[in-house]
Design a protein with these regions (language model features):
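Membrane-embedded alpha-helical bundles that constitute the cytochrome b-like, heme-associated redox core
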Residues: 1-254
Length: 254
């Protein structure tokens, strides 16, 4: 983590040293978990770990649902009913996925408000903020396409209205709308595209989350006083901070 003096991973056993020279993945995990974190963080800082849980929750439940879903206009709704009625625990998995999305957005709005209130968008954390906003846009796109997948009346007309917004762009809007729909109107090609992107984007979000974490590990965490951690030496840093693991992980869990 650039800029903040801290203890680095030191391999001890022969196997650890061998792996560290070739693939320092243990050092990466160590530096991620042991980031010096300001001691004065309040409850507004718990939402990052809530969002991490939500993303993992959505990916796992989504993969299970995708095993039973059929992206075809004649079978999509029936496949959702099949999940609800015939798949063991299918109704629970679907509701966990749908309500998990609500928790995801609830947590991300508080996370964004925290950033606005405490100035986390200001230097030196602009990149962290920008990546976070890209994640938010990807979340909105993923949620919208997931809403379309059951292929009921609200799904169909929702897809028609939202894609129609792109058609209103002067000059280039109509080609963009046609490309999004896969044809002149909402149809099977649209459903296939939306399902494919709905499955893909969560993994894009996961990659962006890794970049997001990398960015704030480089600059250090913000805190309620908005004061920067003193960085003269490891001893000085330890007076202002504690390691993220185990102190803040345990605090966030409880």
């Amino acid at each position: 983590m650039a800029g903040i003096p801290h203890d680095h991973y030191e391999p001890k056993s022969g196997l650890e040293k061998w792996l560290h020279k070739r693939l320092p993945v243990v050092a990466l995990v160590y530096d991620t978990l042991m980031i010096p974190t300001p001691r004065n963080l309040n409850w507004m800082w718990i939402w990052g770990i809530v969002l991490t849980y939500c993303l993992a929750h959505m990916i796992v439940t989504g993969i299970v649902l995708a095993m039973h879903y059929t992206p075809h206009v004649d079978m999509a709704f029936a496949s959702v009913e099949h999940i609800m009625r015939d798949v063991n625990g299918g109704h629970m998995i679907r509701y966990l996925h749908a309500n998990g999305a609500s928790l995801f957005f609830f947590a991300v709005y508080i996370h964004i408000f925290r950033g606005l209130y405490y100035g986390s968008y200001k230097a030196p954390r602009e990149v962290t903020w920008i990546v976070g906003m890209i994640i938010y846009l990807c979340m909105m796109g993923t949620a919208f396409m997931g809403y379309v997948l059951p292929w009921g009346q609200m799904s169909f007309w929702g897809a028609t209205v939202i894609t129609g917004l792109f058609g209103a762009i002067p000059g280039i809007g109509e080609p963009i709308q046609t490309w999004l729909l896969g044809g002149p109107a909402v149809d099977n090609a649209t459903l296939n595209r939306f399902f494919s992107l709905h499955y893909l984007l969560p993994f894009v979000i996961a990659a962006l989350v890794a970049v997001h974490i990398w960015a704030f590990h480089s600059t250090g965490n913000n805190n309620p006083t908005r004061g920067e951690v003193r960085r003269g030496s490891k001893e000085v840093v330890k007076k202002d901070t504690l390691p993220f693991w185990p102190y803040f992980v345990i605090k966030d869990l409880f």
